[in-house]
Amino acid sequence: MACVLLFRLFLLLVLAAFSQGKRLGPTSPLRYSRFLDPSRAVFLRWDFDYEAEIITFELQVQTTGWVGLGITDRYTFVGSDLVVGGVLPNGNVYFSDQHLLDEDTLEQDGSQDAELLRLTEDAVSTTMRFSRPFRTCDPHDRDITSDTMRVLAAYGPDDIPKMSREHTFVKSIFLLQMLQYDDQDAPEDTIIHDLKISNFIIPEDDTTYACTFLPLPIVSKKHHIYKFEPILVERNETMVHHVLVYACGNSSVLPTGIGECYGSDPAFSLCSHVIAGWAVGGLSYQFPDDVGISIGTPFDPQWIRLEIHYSNFQNLPGIRDTSGMRLFYTSHLRKYDMGVLQLGISVFPIHFIPPGAEAFLSYGLCKTDKFEELNGAPVSDIYISACLLHTHLAGRSLQALQYRNGTQLQVVCKDFSYDFNLQESRDLPHPVVIKPGDELLIECHYQTLDRDFMTFGGASTINEMCLIFFFYYPRINISSCMGYPDIIYVTNELGEEASENPMENLMVLDNVEWTPENIKKAEKACKESQQTVLIKTIDEEVENTTGWIPDIIPTPRGPCLESTGGKVEPQDNTPAGFRAVPLALSGSNTATLRPLPMIAVLFLQGSLSCLLAMLQTGV
């Protein structure tokens, strides 16, 4: 009997070990932080347990009244969730999980899914710390995913929770960041090298792409770039949309000075292999500890093209700029050389989005079966560690999917809540393995309800792009792999007379009556047409191939967590959550197991002997 009880206790311990993550307590340090308001009176700290799917927030506000924190969307505060708390004058605390019935009215949720960890007040500020599951079973709670989260913070001067525009703030944040740079290696011999445009006068135009060619650091032996960050001139930040650094082939003949990147002189558009990138809303980016961008060998670039996209919508005159990119490099070599692969839809007008579209999906295909031929050497598996997603103002979501032998394997990276004003490189939870012959598909979702004109692919902010940059290792000689649809097929499917000249077909499409039916017909034709895939090497060699857009199987949401603590498999097919299909369903035969706690190991030794005894005696 004692053995039976011991064995049952062991099973309970094992189940507990695998079902519980590391809970953060009232005073545990939290890795991430942001100010949520311009005056820096609202400060958020947070951390999460990815395996247990629990996130912990700590909101500190300069008020002695109520405070609130939640998640909203890009269109309206209505339906936003908001956890509200404060300290009464008598020292008692109040705390509840609520939601917004309208932009002014709060209502308490029927299910209280936020757990209070700490709520304090001093003469200046109120601090509220609480935790909640990534996904609750309460329809009034927004899911916490790897998408861009629009974090809502609100407060008041007293203890009567009431929304006011003056004290309400929304900030787009990647809550589920995978790496914290303070935990990463910062070599003692770090050297800094700045790549800056030289005293450039920003033109009085809505959009300018300025390019200049600059040398990389001159080193006598191999070094690794392990981090980059933007250099932004104070007061010019609102004009700089993105900064890109392209590696040049060492045989390239490069121009001098500063020129329009995509203007009349094609020399200023030379070099197309991105090695570092920043866009509006982003911060610095540091590679994982075992990878870096190689410089200093005969195979490495010696020069780069610095591209800065300016948006001077107010047409301000005489603004001088010296923005650019700061590189951090070291002689302490990492295990792998990092590469950057650009995927998506080729950036020219064959990519189009009709006006007045509630939703329009565009696709860019990449086929890797020619990589080895273009690389000039055998290509082994490559590992994707991070990605940077990029569209312009009409973009609403993006995702990159991986296929092998015609079967969808996984979503490599995605953002179903994309924000043009927050474009940061984001680390993946685990490296994604790409094998030779795999196909990669980029899907972009656009909305053009505010436009009465066609939107074409192009460099201007009012044009569109559909791009995802993969940071991967080990580096190969491929710089980009982009697709575009057969515009002749699309024109015919819309009932128009097609021309062999692609630009004439675009003029025809520009005159189509874009009813909802024609918008859907165009989207369907673009997806069903044969894709031309352009593969480019670092040395600007280009190879074409063709392919077809595969079907996309939506990833089901994972189970929700009830306020009682139990997980529930929802009976829905909403393609929302950050979680992939469970390993048992994905065809994988491997899984990473977490180590058992020591107490379970000790019980295991006794339980196995008891189990053997029970089997022998028939108990």
From Swiss-Prot:
Residues 1-21 form the signal peptide. It is a single-pass type I membrane protein. Residues 616-619 are cytoplasmic. CDD domains: DOMON_DOH (cd09631). GO terms for molecular function: copper ion binding; dopamine beta-monooxygenase activity. The gene is Moxd2. Residues 40-156 form the DOMON domain. GO terms for cellular component: membrane. Residues 22-594 are extracellular. This is DBH-like monooxygenase protein 2. PANTHER family: DBH-LIKE MONOOXYGENASE PROTEIN 2-RELATED, DOPAMINE BETA HYDROXYLASE RELATED. Belongs to the copper type II ascorbate-dependent monooxygenase family. Cu cation B binds at H390, H392, M465. The keyword Transport does not apply. Glycans are attached at N250, N405, N477. It is found in: Membrane. The chain crosses the membrane at residues 595-615.
